[in-house]
Amino acid sequence: AAATKGKGDLMSGGSRLTDMDGNRLNHHTGISCMSQYNVVDRGSVVVIDKAFNIEDAALFGCAVMTGVGAVINTARIRPGDSVAIIGLGGVGLNGIIGSKLAGAETIIAIDIDPSKFSRAEELGATHCFDSRNNDMVEEIRDLTNGGVDYAIDLAGVIQAMDTAYQIIRYGGSVVTAGLSPINTQFSFNHSDLVAQ
């Protein structure tokens, strides 16, 4: 499915829709649900009980599923693990919630905006770091005795991925679910990757 997103194809491949002039219409992220009515693959549909508030349900479409999913389904955080969540928007804050649900012992919240830290702590963050702090990487490595087990980029910017690779322990994992602009390139020192 991920390969279809950059091309604007349906999950089954291609497109079924055209505009009034017959030009092919592409889909955004394989679903294209920014409208009142949608045609989607059945794997992308969840039935919502009519008693559930639709405004509350809207959160689950992206922020909850992506943030909690990155922690629970992709990283597979376990009780006692240390995790850093980079980016404290809606998706990142749900990554904090997912980390707490998974039983992570150390949950580090990282963002460029310290005003988000109090909410992150309310949701389960044990430590918060301003990513503009030049000593942040060293402080996190000291706090975690060499680095976190998991660093999860939920910001979708190069600096977040850079930070993620710098703060993991040897053998640690980096997960990203942050969406960057389509042509964004991330590079890293290959020997650092092999050493990790």
Q: Where are the language model's segments positioned?
A:
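Short SAM/SAH-binding signature in class I
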Residues: 146-152, 172
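Glycine-rich phosphate/adenylate-binding loop and adjacent beta-alpha elements
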Residues: 1-45
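Mid-domain Rossmann-like dinucleotide-binding core that forms the NAD(H)/NADP(H) cofactor-binding site
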Residues: 37, 43-44, 49-134, 138-139, ...
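A generic alpha-to-beta junction signature in SAM-dependent methyltransferases
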Residues: 77, 144, 155, 167-169
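Short amphipathic alpha-helical segments
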Residues: 96-97, 121-122, 141, 163-166, ...
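Glycine-rich phosphate-binding loop and adjacent beta-alpha segment
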Residues: 158-196
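Short, hinge-like loop/turn segments at secondary-structure boundaries
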Residues: 124-128, 146, 192-195
